């Protein structure tokens, strides 16, 4: 199955990490489509592409991201690339080497789409922690049992599905949430790789979560599930006591 990795960019210097991580993938039947979001960004982006062996570029004459949102590119890309599976990668994040291989294997098991878990890094690329509290997909976020979330850079979706649901990307902050909501509703056959292979950089922008958010959330989940975190140990059943003699199996 041929994979397309989609990255909209305005030349963030961190793009070099994204490029290198795609080049290092153990799964090799892939193309990294770099959508340069505005002709004014061509030169700074091209200076970072030297040596990137998987790249094809698409130059947009006008900026459509309005600063740093690339969701309009994600919405349109499924109609523009030649691939069986689409992965999305923000320009300031990156993948572990086995990321795409694990996602493809999961889809080959019969799923329409799949997602990974993620690791959290500071703005300089230093590892902080695993995210075991927010981007969990099937399992709710730590602060609200009604809310589920998957980060943009964790998805892998069959292109045929992405074409039918791509419009759900259209939006600004929180578009990954509305995409997940629509994708899981219309294509409920999906699964998690149970591996933290997406690398998420905390960048300190006004909408960015903090290290303290994950510290608190991971602590809450540890108290809730103990050592048997179900997204890391999918074969284990976890029981939560919700009343005298009453246990909820998850």
How does the language model describe each region?
Residues 1-21:
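N-proximal low-complexity "stem/linker" segments adjacent to membrane-targeting elements
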Residues 44-80:
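Active-site-proximal specificity loops/subdomain of glycosyltransferases
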Residues 119-126, 153, 193-224:
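Active-site donor/metal-binding and catalytic loop motifs
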Residues 101-129:
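Conserved donor NDP-sugar-binding/catalytic core segment of glycosyltransferases
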Residues 20-29:
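Short, acidic, metal-binding catalytic loop of nucleotide-sugar glycosyltransferases
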Residues 30-41, 58-62:
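Short beta-strand/loop segment that forms part of the nucleotide-sugar
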Residues 83-94:
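Short beta-strand-to-loop acidic/aromatic patch adjacent to the donor-nucleotide binding site
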Residues 172-179:
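Acidic donor-binding loop at a coil-to-helix junction in glycosyltransferase catalytic cores
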């Amino acid at each position: 199955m041929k994979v397309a990795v989609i990255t909209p960019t305005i030349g963030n210097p961190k793009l070099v990490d994204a490029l290198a991580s795609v080049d290092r993938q153990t799964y090799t039947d892939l193309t990294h489509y770099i959508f340069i979001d505005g002709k004014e960004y061509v030169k700074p982006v091209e200076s970072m592409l030297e040596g990137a062996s998987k790249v094809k570029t698409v130059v947009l004459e006008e900026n459509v991201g309005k600063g740093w949102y690339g969701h309009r590119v994600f919405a349109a890309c499924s109609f523009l690339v030649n691939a069986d599976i689409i992965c999305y990668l923000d320009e300031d994040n990156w993948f572990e080497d086995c990321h795409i291989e694990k996602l493809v294997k999961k889809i080959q098991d019969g799923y329409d789409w799949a997602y990974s878990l993620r690791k959290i890094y500071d703005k300089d690329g230093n590892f902080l922690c695993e995210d075991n509290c927010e981007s969990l997909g099937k399992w709710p976020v730590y602060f609200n049992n009604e809310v589920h979330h998957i980060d943009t850079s964790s998805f892998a979706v069959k292109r045929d599905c992405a074409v039918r649901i791509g419009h759900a990307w259209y939006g600004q902050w929180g578009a990954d949430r509305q995409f997940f909501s629509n994708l899981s509703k219309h294509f409920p056959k999906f699964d998690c790789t149970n591996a933290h292979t997406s690398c998420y950089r905390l960048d300190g922008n006004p909408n960015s979560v903090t290290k303290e958010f994950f510290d608190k959330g991971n602590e809450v989940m540890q108290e809730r599930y103990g050592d048997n975190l179900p997204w890391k140990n999918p074969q284990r059943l976890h029981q939560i006591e919700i009343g005298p003699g009453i246990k909820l199996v998850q």
